Amino acid sequence: MDRVLSRADKERLLELLKLPRQLWGDFGRMQQAYKQQSLLLHPDKGGSHALMQELNSLWGTFKTEVYNLRMNLGGTGFQGSPPRTAERGTEESGHSPLHDDYWSFSYGSKYFTREWNDFFRKWDPSYQSPPKTAESSEQPDLFCYEEPLLSPNPSSPTDTPAHTAGRRRNPCVAEPDDSISPDPPRTPVSRKRPRPAGATGGGGGGVHANGGSVFGHPTGGTSTPAHPPPYHSQGGSESMGGSDSSGFAEGSFRSDPRCESENESYSQSCSQSSFNATPPKKAREDPAPSDFPSSLTGYLSHAIYSNKTFPAFLVYSTKEKCKQLYDTIGKFRPEFKCLVHYEEGGMLFFLTMTKHRVSAVKNYCSKLCSVSFLMCKAVTKPMECYQVVTAAPFQLITENKPGLHQFEFTDEPEEQKAVDWIMVADFALENNLDDPLLIMGYYLDFAKEVPSCIKCSKEETRLQIHWKNHRKHAENADLFLNCKAQKTICQQAADGVLASRRLKLVECTRSQLLKERLQQSLLRLKELGSSDALLYLAGVAWYQCLLEDFPQTLFKMLKLLTENVPKRRNILFRGPVNSGKTGLAAALISLLGGKSLNINCPADKLAFELGVAQDQFVVCFEDVKGQIALNKQLQPGMGVANLDNLRDYLDGSVKVNLEKKHSNKRSQLFPPCVCTMNEYLLPQTVWARFHMVLDFTCKPHLAQSLEKCEFLQRERIIQSGDTLALLLIWNFTSDVFDPDIQGLVKEVRDQFASECSYSLFCDILCNVQEGDDPLKDICEYS
């Protein structure tokens, strides 16, 4: 065992197996330790891949070498290496061999033969050891013949015992001597025949207890020798292999005519009886079909790996098996079943009141069709399938009730009303509602009774979405109230609004978008009452006092934002606190449609903040803070630094990636921006991105006018885009506007002119300049 592995490999293997050195060679314990370590070192169990690979390599080498050692070692030590020469006294005395001749007493070795020859001489002095030859000392014969011998011929008691047809080789051992080339044994034709009572010898592959050869008897015996099996006999006087260390004598087999004739007749009788017992089967003339007829393809389910259940099935097998299945299919409680013949086969069509899997039906039928072919499929169209299988070329044999009818498969149509999703989507699109929760709130409110609705009776301006759509959507809202997919319906409607808005941005020019926004504002102004009209005119008067020549300034700003020329499109509002910057920016966002962004946040959160600008006409960077303030009371911030890092966004020359949460990035031109900030110092790189800069100053009379007229603040007239739209139509002629809305502009101007004359508007303007309530001594607003 010390030669199986090198010393380093042996120590490494024992280390991996976690075994002490004294257990080297204990194959059982080593194998058990290998299994335990394999579970610990396997990569799938959390072990090391390298250690597992090393253990497998060493263990495989160890097993291979041990196997080769067992196969190759005999009386000569390792295969291909001559045994050491011992002293003559030791070799002749029959004592133990040298310490390096492993397994020297193994079966068939020279020491094994010597010991047993000495043993037999003690009991039988007449025993003669077989002669030794040069060939017999090379390799032991380990073949053991286990077939029973043929009965001896009683008429020839003096026949010479037959010997083996040569020495058998161990298939696992490579023979070093090529001169030994025994013929392979022939395969026996006949079955085993019983050994006669007179045969006392037997066995093979070594020395027998009686001292005879493998087919012979003891020398002093009186029994006649047995004939060798026919597949060991060789024709003529062909010389066979000689004796070896196992006790086989050199000789040759000679054929016996009687044995040959007896074996030939015995072989023929066995072959004849075997032929009569199992005659060859004829090939089936009509092979089993591979699928259902093509005329039934459209009515069957062709799913193979499906767990879906069905109430109707069609079984295809032989006629006899289908008849048997027709009688035993009651396990599934069929409501209807019929037996059909088709060519050489049959079909069973049945319907059940409960649904079953196809595999369950097929497994049940396969118990009765172990040999016959069987096919089973579910029927998706029972009535149509029944009409086909009961017509030619099919032949209806029997059925448990007179046919199937169409009325058995159709129920009276039940009128089930569902929520009209399209109607909800149209409602959201008409009112520009992109909030799913707001849409759901409106529709749940529409489920109330229209006659008793308080919101509809008041018809307030801020509730016009409700009282304009309540009666129209009341019936659909009742169905929506009991619907389980309310959130899904509202989310789809909101997505439709966003999709329509994005499509409009792609297809329309910015001038067309501005025209549409102005038209919506004019329509809202047209619906105002007299008191509300004066309130909006007060807001127009307040804005005209905010900046010098404010109508022209507003017109330039709208033109700048609409044309959207790269590097000539951004506007900066800079001034002290409470100077009107945020109010004007909010009104622009309301008029044009946009979002307000906060870029004073850290840079890692800026990406999602900028993503809000998707599909917007304009954005507002509100209250941007810088690092260097002209007013020492201002707090520093990161807004200006972030603006400096957004040059591609501010320029509008290239598309930038905008991303929102739970959605993919979208590449588009960043919209123009209106930036409001206090008195901070801007770097030159940021200053160059603004084409128009408006410096605001604090005007106490404007602040006092707002404080004295709380309705301007409560109704957010200053922050409304409708106020700026009214300012445009109040100060410009209709020719300035698009021809499509010139008629609406003239109509709204005439409406407001009828409510407020020019002299009355001048009084409102004077009140604002004096810091009084704009509507003082003009009207009482409540």
Curated annotation (Swiss-Prot):
Residues 148-161, 233-247, 264-274 have a biased composition (Low complexity). GO terms for biological process: DNA replication; symbiont-mediated perturbation of host cell cycle G1/S transition checkpoint; symbiont-mediated suppression of host innate immune response; symbiont-mediated suppression of host JAK-STAT cascade via inhibition of JAK1 activity; symbiont-mediated suppression of host type I interferon-mediated signaling pathway. Residues 199-209 have a biased composition (Gly residues). The keyword Protease does not apply. It is found in: Host nucleus. Its cofactor is Mg(2+). A motif (LXCXE motif) lies at residues 142-146. A motif (Nuclear localization signal) lies at residues 279-286. The modification Phosphothreonine is found at T278. The J domain is essential for multiple viral activities, including virion assembly, viral DNA replication, transformation and transcriptional activation. The LXCXE motif specifically binds to host pRB, RBL1, and RBL2. This is Large T antigen.
